[in-house]
Regions:
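Intrinsically disordered, low-complexity glycine/charged-rich regulatory or linker segments
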Residues: 1-187, 311-415
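Beta-strand cores of modular interaction/reader domains in eukaryotic scaffold and signaling proteins
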Residues: 107-112, 132-135, 196, 234-238, ...
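A short acidic (Asp/Glu
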Residues: 117-123, 144-149, 206-208, 245-251, ...
């Protein structure tokens, strides 16, 4: 797993936290050439929108952990979690040695969590009925398919009574609510051992503005986490691109509050997308009393300013060091190159008229990678999967993929000792 350790920032930078808007949307401030190259190649995806959603699963090395193998009715992993985010959390916790072995009960909070894959992973790893796991996500009252609520989680919630759903003061589960922010701070301030934030949108129709569109939700998740985090605790946050000043500011803020902050992309995250994770370990503050007013002020300004002619530009009112910026450019170069290569490979596969043999080889290789991943993280897997020659559809057809990793099932294949906890590499 590729990962970068960010430079530490002075701990009193919280005094410079602010919400700053400008009249125009700002251009990228780092890695400009990479930004525009990604912009161009992502636009090529639009040409093959239908085919892309199929063939991206062939070029993703770890797709078949949770996705049905072509011409088969099963995937590599026997375990069927609430969502494929379960596998990402298993991988992140193990690789970064997030402590899940405490003999004392722990408290965890999971922001933008529906349908519950991150909580499910922690519940499995801990296997403690005296822990408290709290999930908060936007409540969907209109059956919006783009809002991953708790609909699939009924069986899981019934089996795990120590998983609590928090809907906030207004009952909406909306993180971008000032009332909910104040309420969560009063209820859970400085008390959480482990926090996750997995917020996102359906970006399929707007790849190019992912980073900007995520800004407010990203910052909202961060201020919630900082207010709730217990001293010594850990936080895992999903991010996307990092070209804009506001994203850089958020990473700098996190680097000032934690001993170690990493940026990484799990193997179970599709290589052709912009998704990455920030892993923060060792929270430095004993309470939030000193920094809460600064977070409240900036968050209040952000959620109350709905002027469509104004654009968020900064969350810090001071410049950052050249060293910090250069490290982010280094990480952009590595992750960006990997993403470009996988997008290019997928588009080339789509355009290839004689793709059957190539697809067959990809599937065979990727199945073995998925099996090795399951072995590494002690996840039960189907070890009698075979792919016969000439089992694929003609190149003029499109394979039929169906997901089973996004539906909840009973976990009879898991033994008490198959927890998914292994020593990191």
């Amino acid at each position: 797993m590729i990962h970068f350790l960010l430079p530490r920032i002075q701990p009193n930078i919280y005094k410079n936290i602010d919400y700053i808007e400008e009249n125009e949307k700002k251009d990228p401030v780092i890695s400009n050439s990479l930004f525009f190259y990604l912009f161009d190649i992502k636009n090529k995806i639009d040409i093959y929108e239908k085919e892309w959603n199929i063939y991206k699963k062939y070029t993703n090395p770890y797709e078949f952990i949770h996705t049905n193998i072509p011409m088969k009715k099963r995937c590599v992993c026997k375990y069927k979690p609430l969502s494929r985010s379960y596998f990402k959390m298993i991988e992140l916790i193990n690789f970064f040695q997030i402590n899940m072995n405490s003999t004392l009960p722990i408290k965890t909070f999971h922001l933008a969590e529906g349908p519950g894959g991150f909580i499910e992973a922690v519940v499995k790893l801990r296997n403690r009925k005296d822990d408290s796991y709290i999930g908060m996500t936007l409540i969907d009252n209109e059956n919006n398919s783009n809002i991953p609520g708790w609909k699939k989680s009924e069986i899981f919630l019934n089996e795990n009574k120590n998983v609590i759903l928090e809907n906030g003061m207004d009952g909406t589960g909306n993180i971008l609510s000032l009332d909910n922010f104040v309420y969560v701070n009063e209820m859970y301030g400085s008390s959480m051992d482990f926090i996750t934030a997995d917020g996102g949108f359906d970006f399929s129709l707007d790849f190019d503005n992912q980073e900007y569109n995520m800004t407010k939700l990203l910052y909202g998740q961060v201020v919630y986490a900082l207010c709730m985090q217990k001293m010594g605790g850990s936080f895992i946050l999903k991010v996307f691109d990092c070209f804009m000043q506001q994203t850089i500011d958020i990473l700098a803020i996190l680097s000032s509050f934690y001993e170690d902050v990493y940026i990484t992309k799990p193997q179970t995250s599709r290589y052709a997308n912009s998704e990455k994770y920030v892993v923060c370990k060792g929270f430095k503050q004993t309470t939030n009393h000193n920094f809460y007013p600064f977070l409240y002020n900036s968050f209040s300004k952000m959620v109350s300013n709905e002027n469509p002619t104004k654009f968020v530009s900064n969350f810090l009112n001071i410049p950052l060091s050249y060293f910090f910026i250069s490290k982010l450019e280094e990480y952009n170069a590595i992750f960006g190159q990997q993403q470009i290569e996988y997008i290019h490979t997928t588009i080339t596969l789509i355009e290839n008229k004689y793709k059957d043999f190539k697809i067959e080889n990809l599937v065979k290789i990727n199945i073995q990678k998925c099996i090795q991943w399951c072995i590494k993280y002690q996840i039960p897997y189907n070890n009698n999967i075979t792919i016969n020659t000439n089992t694929f559809l003609s190149s003029s057809s499109t394979p039929n993929f169906s997901f089973i990793g996004d539906s909840f099932g009973r976990h009879n294949d898991i033994t008490p000792h198959s927890t998914g906890v292994v020593a990191p590499p």
